[in-house]
């Protein structure tokens, strides 16, 4: 899965797109998190699992957001 995410100088998410994963669910996630603060999204989505997998698309988005904050 590839995640492209951008945020402004106030850590407000401006754009998110995923390559791979469940298209409908990911479109919903993108719309819900756009305009939200990075830390708020991480607090809500970190640690979500997908079935027996240790991670999920929302959890992977959190990892991408954490990397973005480090830039």
Description of each model-found segment:
Residues 1-71:
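Active-site- and interface-proximal helix/loop "cap" or "latch" segments in soluble metabolic
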